[in-house]
Regions:
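Short pre-active-site segment immediately N-terminal to redox-active cysteine/selenocysteine motifs
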Residues: 52-56, 64, 132
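Sec/Tat signal peptide C-region and signal peptidase I cleavage site
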Residues: 13-17
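Second-shell loop/turn segments in exported
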Residues: 32-35, 78-79, 122-126
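Electrostatic cytochrome c docking/interface patches
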Residues: 19-52
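C-terminal capping alpha-helices of c-type cytochrome domains
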Residues: 88, 92-93, 109-145
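Domain-scale selection of a single, long terminal region
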Residues: 1-4, 24-26
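Bacterial N-terminal signal peptides
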Residues: 2-12
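Gly/Gly-Pro-rich "capping" loops immediately C-terminal to redox-active cysteine motifs
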Residues: 39, 48, 58, 62-99, ...
Length: 145
């Protein structure tokens, strides 16, 4: 039920229809190449992570964003993410966390295939655009221990 609520909230975000889908290649445990062909903006990525209407990351994760209260405790702390994973590994986790844990409650923010119970209005549309994914990856990569 929680997963359904998370996905429903994410699918209602305005960013959903903002981007054309771009192909990506998974190499082992990462997507090495940027989805946009350029680096993301860490400041925009931080804003996406903190925004409870766009990324909803803090619904489940805790992160080094002290001005945001009531952060989640269902998923790993985002602090130190840039020390634990490469940009490519972070990218794949945001694009499709199910690659690492098939029972995760984290929705695939960019994958649109093989999803269950998606309303027609949201079918074949990623939750975050390629640019937003790259911005989030750029921000998470700055979070070093």
């Amino acid at each position: 039920m929680l997963l359904g609520a998370i996905v429903a909230a994410l699918l209602a975000t305005p960013a959903l229809a903002a981007d054309v889908r771009r192909a990506y290649v998974v190499n082992g445990d990462e997507i090495k190449a940027s989805l946009t062909g350029r680096a993301g903006d860490p400041a925009r990525g931080r804003a996406i992570v903190a925004n409870r209407q766009v990324g909803l990351c803090l619904l489940c994760h805790t992160g080094p964003i002290p001005e945001e209260r009531f952060q989640g405790d269902l998923a790993p702390d985002l602090g130190g993410a840039g020390s634990r994973w490469t940009e490519g590994q972070l990218r794949l986790r945001v694009v499709d966390a199910e690659r690492f844990n098939p029972t995760t409650i984290m929705p695939p923010y960019f994958r649109t295939e093989k999803l269950a119970r998606v309303a027609k209005a949201f079918a074949d549309k990623p939750i975050l655009s390629a640019e937003q994914i790259e911005d989030v990856v750029a921000y998470l990569a700055t979070l070093k221990d």
